[in-house]
Structure formats: structure tokens, C-alpha cells
């Protein structure tokens, strides 16, 4: 049985973290536009020919949607967004998924329960911009007209497990479902959370839905913001050093404790006003 843990990154935007712990028997693969520095624990590969034809956002979506095409000899895959830090051996999580006999493994959304609330939120925070408002409204109206139940599976998609089903009808069904997901992304908004519930409803894939979310405290993942800058790059470098070499843990943890305990509160204190 071959399993791949993989991510896809645009290094001008994404930060890459070295996994804290290895997952024996699971091959960790990183696709990116160039080889990252100061990162260990990933097998780096250049983007595939299909990814190279796309802009960075769509290249990531292609990798996210089509692991069975990218890894034709794999039986299972675990996709993770580049800004997730893998904090533990993922084999127990994989074992849960395999035992469920599901085609795809997903995590419930941490704050919203359906695509209608998600679309309104995306409008409010600018993830769907005014020129796309009508397209977003058309999208959710189309899904409702096509029979998507009012109560449906609604997930956050930064971690996805899949059973590839090589040579089986289930494998062909998974690939067809992912192709439908890609088509929805091309037709409507680029928010894949809005389109996946319809894909799951239409395809009939068997879903393993965990009862916890990877954004909440858990043994397997920690999530960091995408923002980049000199201070963020230094932070990433130190995190990766800490996890790759025990020698770095004491000074880094000591410096971080000093910052949190003394420097950060002092920096945040308002300066007293001068009298007179």
C-alpha cells in the first residue's frame, strides 16, 4: 500500500514548514515553483507539466483536486495546504480513514454550516469581490435548483484524504467527481468550499467526515497565516530549525518565552502622556 502526503506552494506567497514528526510509510512530497530553503522532511518536486501551464492559484487547485493523476501508483493520498504544519505521525489518522472505507475524508467547517452563509461571509470579507457577487448568487441558486439539500455536508478543505481506488470503478468515480469539481471552479467562483457540497451530492462519493476541525487544537496539524515578510520568514526559519535539530530548541524556546513574557507586553504598553 502506497500513501502520499503532499502539498503545493507558490514560494512568493506560501510558507513551507518542515513536518515535526515523520509518518513512516507515507511519502511526503512538496510541489513548488522553486526548491525551498531551510526546509527538511519533504521530497521536493517541480510542478507537473499540467500545473506549470496554470497561474499559481489554479496550479494549487489542480494539485489539490487530482492526486490520483499526479500519483498514479499511490493507493491513498493526504493533501494539506502549504501553511499547515504537520505536528505528528499521520498514520493513526490514515488508519481511521481506511477503516471507514470512504472515498474521501474531510473536516467540518469550523464556523459555518452551509454554502449560503459561506457566500455571504466571503462577500463581507472580500474573498468574493463585488464583480463576482452575481456569479456567486447564480452558483448557489444553481446548486439549490439541482437538488442540493438545504442541510448538506459543508467542509473546510485545507486537509483532504482520498482513496484512489486504482483500477476500480470507485477510482473512476472519484476522478469523475474531481473533474466535476474542477469544472465548477471554472464556471463559477474560485471558492472551492462553495462547490464541493454540490460535487459530493451529485457524485455520491462515500465521505468520512471527522467530528473535529484541524483549526481547533488537535494532535496532527497547526495552521499559520499566508502572509510573508522578513519577520515572518525569520519566524519560519526558526520553527523549521527547531523541529529539525534538538540543539535549536532551548535557545529558540527561550527567546520566544522572553518575547512573550517581557518584550511583547512592554511593546504593547501605551506610553504615558507628558504633563503640561
Predicted regions and their residues:
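Glycosyltransferase catalytic domains, chiefly GT-A lineage
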Residues: 1-276
